[in-house]
Amino acid sequence: MKISKHKLTTLFTAGIALVMIASFGHAANLSDQDKKFLTSYEKIHVALAADDLASAKAAATELGDSGSDIAKANSLKDARTGFEKLSARAKTTAAGQSGYHVAHCPMLNKDWVQTSTTISNPYGGKGMIGCGEIQK
């Protein structure tokens, strides 16, 4: 059976469209509250990966009571302990959503959610920035 280039292109385009529709459908399942949580969580993640306690605390205030452990933290260690609690919620919230990846650091045995496929370890900070792997 021979398939013309035009039919093959049409099938490929239709397949891509279906994948995109499915991806957008998953993202649409997030409530506004979940989207806000994940946005603030990502800000905290980026700040902790950069060892920036002040920015992590500022982003945590956007989460109200959920972010209070980080907002009140006096050290990066304390902020990272609070972040671990948020990561459990982030994993549940982001499960099955397009654009979110669960990462794991085997050295610290910690998980987190991030939007990039390039590892940015919030638990190890600048000293361990690339330690971890995206979970499949």
Per-segment meaning from a language model:
Residues 1-2, 58:
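Intrinsic low-complexity, intrinsically disordered segments enriched in polar/basic residues
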Residues 2-13:
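Bacterial N-terminal signal peptides that target proteins for export
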